[in-house]
Each structure stands twice: as structure tokens, then as C-alpha cells.
Swiss-Prot record:
InterPro entries: DNA-dir_RNA_pol_insert, DNA-dir_RNA_pol_RpoA/D/Rpb3, DNA-dir_RpoA, RBP11-like, RNAP_asu_C, RNApol_insert_sf. Its EC number is 2.7.7.6. GO terms for molecular function: DNA binding; DNA-directed RNA polymerase activity; protein dimerization activity. It catalyses: RNA(n) + a ribonucleoside 5'-triphosphate = RNA(n+1) + diphosphate. GO terms for biological process: DNA-templated transcription. HAMAP family: RNApol_bact_RpoA. One of its GO terms (cellular component) is cytoplasm. Keywords: DNA-directed RNA polymerase, Nucleotidyltransferase, Transcription, Transferase. The N-terminal domain is essential for RNAP assembly and basal transcription, whereas the C-terminal domain is involved in interaction with transcriptional regulators and with upstream promoter elements. Homodimer. The RNAP catalytic core consists of 2 alpha, 1 beta, 1 beta' and 1 omega subunit. When a sigma factor is associated with the core the holoenzyme is formed, which can initiate transcription. This is DNA-directed RNA polymerase subunit alpha.
Length: 339
């Protein structure tokens, strides 16, 4: 159907190229190419917004500190004010295996640092940055805290984390639920065959360790896919099963691919076209000497073609029995549809 060409004939990335950062569990760079012109920005901006705002995570939503009535207090023997302690608590990275609120406790006597790793273990909760410093205790000082951990998405300000029946001394905390801490993207021009105006999308993202960068990107894409589904007001007709390639072909069906689909330089592609070399099967039967006798075809173009063919397990000067087949155009079309 003609209408299906709206989406079926658009260029799509073959696969994602993922490069891990210094901390593979937290940092990665993902490249998607080629994309139709303009799609790099469309997809990059959408994914970035969803990654930062819409993924589920866990965070501390409130804290109670023994002997403290409000966040503008100070604690004897503790070097940091309660305001600074709350700011540190806000950055505790948490992985939760439950969507139910949980409580964690911390109790420590000085002197020394109080870190997130000092928080008592809870079965469904994992602290991902145990070295995070919460406060510093002087000799003989003691501190006891109780934290509430909840799950959610995005950013929720402290005032929304105060329950109506909050006890005296409960201090609400800004909840940074998103497991994604940083996202950036850039769009560059790339090449697809002879087209030089395609997009290359590069996304660099960092998480707090609750989810891997690759999984975070996959979840964001799934969210976008699910949100867009409501706009599709039709069902696609079932794709007819493609006719199988003739089993009696005496040669590799990849030879039916046209040479203009190879990523060759403009000079090399034009030389092949001028020499009436249409299919890879035509090309590989040529010897190096024959190719070099082609007008405007030099050693640089020869080396380029040899390298491309080598990547396909082919080379110049091959003998191809049964080439060319009588119905080559029909077979080439069937090959294109099949693969």
C-alpha cells in the first residue's frame, strides 16, 4: 500500500553502538545511525526529557534525627548543621525492590565520618553510594536517624513529602527519584550510501547505578512508544510472506545486491556505473587489471573496492557459475524484499 511508505521507506538505524564509560554500570555513550534528516534532534530531545523526568526510582523522602525539631537546628558534637545534613541525605542513591515505603535507621558514635554505608541494612533496599559522607562527629558525639524511602519518578519537592499527620521533628526531603543523573546528546551529519545528509545521534548518559545506562535508554524508548500508540488510528495489514529465493541458485544470493548500495566514494561509484557494472556479481568477476583499465579508475578506487568486498568475504577475479541469471532483475527484487 502507498500509505505504508510513510514509515516503511524511512531509514532506520541498523543497531545501536554502545561504548561504556569509566564506570560501565553508570556511564555509557550510545550512537544510533543512520537516521533521516531531522530525526536525530526529534529522538534525542524526546529521549533526554523522558530519561530525566519519567523513569521510576527510589529516594529518601523524610528523616527524623533524635533531638532535632526542625532543619534549622544544630546538633552538639556534629560539625554540620542540620540543613547541610539534609542536603547530603538528598543525594543518597538507592535501589529498591519494592514499591512500598520503607524505613532505614542509622546510629553511630564519634569521632569520625558518618556515611551512607552506616545505614542499617534493609532487605529490599540497597545503598548504591555507601561512601557518601552525611556528617562528621566529634569525639563522644552520637547521632541517630530514621529515614523514610519511597519510590516515584522525577523530582518531588520537600513540601509535598510532608504527610498530614507528620510527627514533630519529621523533616521532609526533596526526593530525586530519577535514576538518571545526566543526559546529553548531539546530532551530526552522516552518510548512508550516496546520501550525505543523514543524521547520527549520540547520547551520553549517566545513572546512579540503580539501572544501567542501556536499560534506562530502553525504558525511555518504551515509554515514548507506549505514549504514541494512542495516535495510531489504524491497524497495519498483515505482511504477506515473502516468496523464498529460488533454492536452485548456483551462487551466493548476496551477489544480487546492486553496487550502488555499497558505501563507495562518488568517484568509484561513477566509474562502476560508467562501466555498466550493476550487481556485485558483475563486479567480482572483473580482474584488477580490467578494473584499472576503466576510465578515471585508479589504484585508490581499486583498494577501496577490494576492502569493501573483503568485508563481505568476496574478492575480484572470482568465477561465478550461472551468472548472470536470465531473470536477474526479478531475483534481485526478491533478494531485496527477503533481506
Amino acid at each position: 500500500m502507498v500509505i505504508q511508505k510513510n514509515w516503511q521507506e524511512l531509514i532506520k538505524p541498523n543497531k545501536l553502538q554502545v561504548t561504556a564509560g569509566d564506570d560501565p554500570k553508570r556511564v555509557a555513550t550510545v550512537v544510533a545511525e543512520p537516521l533521516e534528516r531531522g530525526f536525530g534532534t526529534t529522538l534525542g530531545n524526546s529521549l533526554r526529557r523522558v530519561l530525566l523526568s519519567s523513569l521510576q526510582g527510589a529516594a529518601v523522602t523524610s528523616v527524623q534525627i533524635d533531638g532535632v525539631l526542625h532543619e534549622f537546628s544544630s546538633i552538639p558534637g556534629v560539625r554540620e548543621d542540620v540543613t547541610d545534613i539534609v542536603l547530603n541525605i538528598k543525594t543518597i542513591a538507592i535501589r529498591s525492590q519494592t514499591d512500598q515505603p520503607k524505613r532505614m535507621t542509622l546510629r553511630k558514635t564519634g569521632p569520625g565520618l558518618v556515611t551512607a554505608g552506616d545505614i542499617g541494612a534493609v532487605g529490599d533496599i540497597q545503598i548504591l553510594n555507601p561512601d557518601l559522607v552525611i556528617c562528621t562527629l566529634d569525639d563522644g558525639a552520637e547521632i541517630r536517624m530514621e529515614f523514610t524511602v519511597a519510590t516515584g519518578k522525577g523530582y518531588v519537592p520537600a513540601e509535598r513529602n510532608r504527610p498530614e499527620d507528620a510527627p514533630i521533628g519529621l523533616i521532609p526531603v526533596d526526593a530525586l527519584y530519577s535514576p538518571v543523573t545526566k543526559v546529553s546528546y548531539r546530532v551530526e551529519t552522516t552518510r548512508e550510501g550516496q546520501d550525505l545528509d543523514k543524521d547520527k545521534l549520540t547520547i551520553t548518559l549517566e545513572t546512579n547505578g540503580a539501572v544501567s545506562p542501556e536499560d534506562a535508554l530502553a525504558y525511555a524508548a518504551r515509554i515514548i512508544q507506549d505514549q504514541l500508540q494512542v495516535f495510531v488510528n489504524f491497524e497495519e495489514p498483515r505482511k504477506e510472506e515473502a516468496a523464498p529465493l529460488a533454492p536452485q541458485l548456483p551462487f551466493n544470493p548476496a551477489l544480487l545486491k546492486k553496487v550502488d548500495e555499497l558505501e563507495l566514494s562518488v568517484r568509484s561509484a561513477n566509474c562502476l556505473k560508467n562501466d555498466n557494472i550493476v550487481y556485485i556479481g558483475d563486479l567480482i568477476q572483473k580482474s584488477e587489471g580490467e578494473m584499472l583499465r576503466t576510465p578515471n579508475f585508479g589504484r585508490k578506487s581499486l583498494n577501496e573496492i577490494k576492502e569493501v568486498l573483503a568485508g563481505m568475504g568476496l574478492h575480484l577475479g572470482m568465477d561465478v557459475p550461472g551468472w548472470p541469471p536470465e531473470n536477474i532483475e526479478d531475483l534481485a527484487k526478491r533478494f531485496e524484499e527477503h533481506y
